[in-house]
């Protein structure tokens, strides 16, 4: 049922490929509805983190309430929920979409549809949202709005004839976009008197208020003093404040079915208010939670160690602080013979890992070493037990392994047709299995591959961009596990295994990879007073070796002429000394060596 009040509410989000102008459009909508004064307008209002502004990407979901007055005098409340566009934050997108009834699909008039446009669009369709296409950047000379409209109809299959043509940069036709939202996005429904049901679509920690949950009320009413229960954890809290975003907090008396806002209830830890969870009343609970909750599952693991061992506690505190705001980050302590004490951290993907590392270095001033990222392998041992392996050093010996499986992703790559050969070549080099290809228009092709996740976590994206001059776009999702013939590649320095450099590789590539790494390390590790052999080994078998020559003092400098036996005695003595040194000496491995492992080119 729909109340009179709900008829004037529209909840929508904006989805787009990276750089198609999503955050800029959000700025224009905020400006056009007069939500912020000129003085408060800051470019990309909703991207709060410096990192977000610098990289030009949206990382956390944000929300803002706009009041739009139509020419007829009616006032509409538009709740805009800004979502991240990057594939790593896919699950943030899906929860933000679950809080809406409609989505604006922003498509760049010069580039047309890209891989993430499709991925996010399908996510929106999965959530039964009404999709409103908006074509952006029409002020650019290379814009081709008519062709892009046709493309939207052909590829996605949604009506794009009346799509507003806007320029978010100059503010052209923004009113058309607002009208389209009011006309096309359905109004919310939901009984205001029913038991409370509210979806948490984002939560983060505020040092004064505790955890602030961004919520969309689906049914019922929530106000200060209500006793609430989180359906997933079963914990009960009392509401301290409810309010709306204009983009800053503005407390209100109550939020009713259909509203989007925030609630604080002195919750101490973001883990207790997990994104996707349902809030209900403690006394009058809803029968079942809202669907679509799934905990964030890390896909990529990496070890993070402080460069200075004494900073271990600081690193732990920093990770805990980041985790308060980022429920997708997981970490547990681990030790490495080479690097000392540190943490094994789990991330959603590479961008997520990159951002966490950068935030540790920036916001907490920590010097850290990160090890090569790895994925979760499933191993069935000969005695029938199943283990999940996230750290290559813990891999059981080959005689104990009956079966080893690795995660496989379904990836779609959209590329200009000139580069199809180069892209196919890259995918095959990365053990990709070709599934199908379709032409989106005369110039662009969508290729679908199944590729092992471990092949794309290093530098697949960079390689793809360089082979297509930056034109290809890429999107992936995990589809399951497949058996694989994998071995553990160890690196030995001076006959000692350096555990932090171990990695899991396909058997047929072990030799090439080992040789490559040995050469790379030879260039990076500085010469010492004694000779250092660098060896790559699979099991007990050495497959590659390089030697770093020792630095030598010229012990013959003081012999002018003289007998050969005198010289030989001095050289033998030097050799003995070097030999003794080598037995007790340890090798310092610079941070670059750990990074080099990741960047070995095939």
Curated annotation (Swiss-Prot):
Its main location: membrane. CDD domains: EF4_II, EF4_III, LepA, lepA_C. The keyword Lyase does not apply. It is an enzyme of class 3 (hydrolase). InterPro entries: EF-4 (IPR006297), EFG_III/V (IPR035647), EFG_V-like (IPR000640), EFTu-like_2 (IPR004161), G_TR_CS (IPR031157), LepA_C_sf (IPR038363), LepA_CTD (IPR013842), LepA_IV (IPR035654). GO terms for molecular function: GTP binding; GTPase activity; ribosome binding; translation elongation factor activity. It is a peripheral membrane protein. Its EC number is 3.6.5.n1. It is found in: Cell membrane. Residues 7-189 form the tr-type G domain. Gene3D superfamilies: 3.30.70.240, Elongation factor 4, C-terminal domain (3.30.70.2570), Elongation Factor G (Translational Gtpase), domain 3 (3.30.70.870), P-loop containing nucleotide triphosphate hydrolases (3.40.50.300), Translation factors (2.40.30.10). PROSITE patterns: G_TR_1 (PS00301), G_TR_2 (PS51722). Belongs to the TRAFAC class translation factor GTPase superfamily. Classic translation factor GTPase family. LepA subfamily. PANTHER family: TRANSLATION FACTOR GUF1 HOMOLOG, CHLOROPLASTIC, TRANSLATION FACTOR GUF1-RELATED. Required for accurate and efficient protein synthesis under certain stress conditions. May act as a fidelity factor of the translation reaction, by catalyzing a one-codon backward translocation of tRNAs on improperly translocated ribosomes. Back-translocation proceeds from a post-translocation (POST) complex to a pre-translocation (PRE) complex, thus giving elongation factor G a second chance to translocate the tRNAs correctly. Binds to ribosomes in a GTP-dependent manner. This is Elongation factor 4. It comes from Clostridium botulinum (strain 657 / Type Ba4). The lineage of its organism: Bacteria, Bacillati, Bacillota, Clostridia, Eubacteriales. The gene is lepA.
